[in-house]
Amino acid sequence: MMNWEYMTILEDNMEKKNTAVVTVVGNDTVGIIARVSAVLAQHEANILDISQTVLSGMFNMIMIVDISLSAFAQLSDSLTALGNEMGLQIRIQRSEIFDAMHRI
């Protein structure tokens, strides 16, 4: 008989292997969410959660995306190129890496 707590942790870890965290920071301009979303859609990444705010003209956004159908390296390159084009810092990290880096 399996421990339910263990099963929950295992399922969470399995889900995280297919998710990534996208962060966007830069001067607020029209169309940031639309353009980032378009790149994600082109790479078949599904947005699971999104939070954005603008503080003193600075745009900040974090997205959780399902990358099960995406080629991670190509998606990362496309987001970096979009960031360079728009003057934004756009980063994508696999969820398990993001969690490990931000664990206290």
Residues of each region from the PLM?
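A conserved regulatory-domain signal marking ACT and ACT-like small-molecule sensing domains
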Residues: 2-104
